Amino acid sequence: MAPEIHMPEPLCLIGSTEGHLVTNQEALKILSAITQPVVVVAIVGLYRTGKSYLMNKLAGKEKGFSVGSTVQSHTKGIWMWCVPHPQKPDHTLVLLDTEGLGDVEKDDKKNDTQIFALAILLSSTFVYNTMNKIDQGAIDLLHNVTELTDLLRTRNSSDSNQTEGEGPADMSFFPDLVWTLRDFFLDLQANGHAITSDEYLENSLKLKQGSDERTQTFNLPRLCIQKFFPVKKCFVFDAPALGSKLSQLPTLSNEELNSDFVQDLSEFCSHIFTQSKTKTLPGGIQVNGPRLESLVLTYVDAINSGALPSIENTVVTLARRENSAAVQKAIGHYDQLMSEKVQLPTETLQELLDLHRTCEREAIEIFRKHSFKDEGEFFQKELESLLSAKQDEICKKNADASAALCSTLLGSIFKPLEQEVAQEFYHKPGGHKLFLQRMEQLKANYRQQPGKGTQAEEVLQTYLNAKETVSRTILQTDQVLTDKEIQSKAEQERAEAARLEAQRLEAIRIQEEQRKAEMERQHQEQLRQIALEKARVAQEQQWILKQRAQEEADRIKAEQEAQLRALQQQLQHMREMNHHRRHHHDCVIS
């Protein structure tokens, strides 16, 4: 949902300076910010007939458009008030209050015609406000003699089939007509029957039969009005108040107003809110704030230049302006998307092209959303051409960014090699091989680094090509030093062979001496082992003899102990026998 436009009070949209119409930039800026479709209600009528009062009621405010209570006209030019539409979500109601027609104090009567024409051209509902009744003067004023048909040309200059008096080619562009009759005092009757206000309007615009000049003069404005305004509505208003209260009308509450007037006003506002259509261009293209702004500028420029504002040319001009703006909006959207999505350099060109195509599709969608009547896809082709140039530009930037990054990376990675070359580190036999190995190592390191972009190999190859001279110099130095080294190496090898032979012979001598020494050591060891064995055997024999002697002593001791025990037993036995005998003898005596 688009944000609501906060406009606390009306602003002058179109004024007049020294006979020329001028637009108010502040009001145009407000229009340019309204992205919603607009319902444009403009009111035109004689000065001092209460137009501003009706417009304030449509705005839902007691104050806003200037309401006067004197005979002087208050509103000058066209004033604009943009408010949220009370019954159509996502729509803005644009109210246009106009300078009163027929002001006796105004010198330039042509300005009336210009204001009148602009109100019709800009509105989707045109409110024609008159007093008392529909009379010939009111019809003539609406017709504005023959200037109305001239100012509202819509036919192609090449359209010769449309005859004078026919209506516009695309009636959808023209507003619905709402005729308001203020202080209406007549009875709504015809032929003795009650009629509606709409029937009263239709009866007032009926054509007379006949072809005489007087009849044609009578019919011409009516025919013109019928052709230009196929959708018509009429509202009649009783006097809002009586006497001195009329001068206080803006401050009166509904209770202080004529109840019939309050009812009439309510029905009028309800009709405007529910029936007023969105402003459209030929082809059914809805008008938003910027498109309405372009219409204002186009019509004012045409009128100031003395040209007649052709609706067809206006739509072409508007389409050109809006499509050009749509191209710029699409390009801006593309630039924003690319800046958000693309991080240069991309790893591959295809990655960048895929991002470009995604953003390109969105940009074209933005263009299609904000463009209209792009005949032959002229502006879309222009956009595609600009996007193609953008692609070339971003690809070049991508390549440049990749080249710069890779050059910096190469400088960092190959810096040690550069220092070694400067120090003639590779100016030695085999130096070229070492140089090439070092190059391969650093190239592998470089290729492993991520995010280098599309120029990685090209920048590397350029660097390697630049090092070809260095490589050849190292190779030549290597070859010269290698030849000398080969000769020196041969001599060194011969000397080394002699040294090795001497070492071999010396080793043989030493080994022989070591062998003899080892044999002597082994012989001595054998002798020592024999002596040790003899000593061990002798010691063992001595132990055996000692053991045997001990055993013999133990045997003898055991025999002696046995003999002693036998003797002791005999002695004990003898004692026992003696004791027995004594005891027995004692018994016999007693």
Swiss-Prot record:
Induction: Strongly up-regulated by IFNG and, at lower levels, by LPS. The LPS-induced increase is attenuated in the presence of dexamethasone. Up-regulated by TNF in certain strains. Up-regulation by a combination of IFNG and TNF is synergistic, even in strains that do not respond to TNF alone. By IRF1 in response to bacterial infection. Its EC number is 3.6.5.-. It comes from the Eukaryota. One of its GO terms (molecular function) is G protein activity. The modification Cysteine methyl ester is found at residue 587. Low expression, if any, in many tissues in the absence of stimulation. It is an enzyme of class 3 (hydrolase). Residues 588-590 form a propeptide. It catalyses: GTP + H2O = GDP + phosphate + H(+). Residues 529-590 are annotated as: Required for tetramerization, but not for dimerization. Residues 35-277 form the GB1/RHD3-type G domain. Keywords: Antimicrobial, Cytoplasm, Cytoplasmic vesicle, Golgi apparatus, GTP-binding, Hydrolase, Immunity, Inflammatory response, Innate immunity, Lipoprotein, Membrane, Methylation, Nucleotide-binding, Prenylation. GTP binds at residues 45-52, 67-69, 182-183, 246. CDD domains: GBP, GBP_C. Disruption phenotype: Mutant mice exhibit impaired host defense and NLRP3-dependent inflammatory responses. During LPS-induced sepsis, knockout animals show 60 to 75% reduction in IL1B and IL-18 serum levels compared to wild-type mice. Orogastric challenge with Listeria monocytogenes leads to higher bacterial burdens, discernible weight loss, and 50 to 80% fewer leukocytes expressing active CASP1 in mesenteric lymph nodes compared to wild-type counterparts. Residues 1-306 are annotated as: NLRP3-binding. GO terms for cellular component: cytoplasmic vesicle; cytoplasmic vesicle membrane; Golgi membrane; perinuclear region of cytoplasm; symbiont cell surface. Its main location: membrane. Belongs to the TRAFAC class dynamin-like GTPase superfamily. GB1/RHD3 GTPase family. GB1 subfamily. This is Guanylate-binding protein 5. The lineage of its organism: Eukaryota, Metazoa, Chordata, Craniata, Vertebrata.
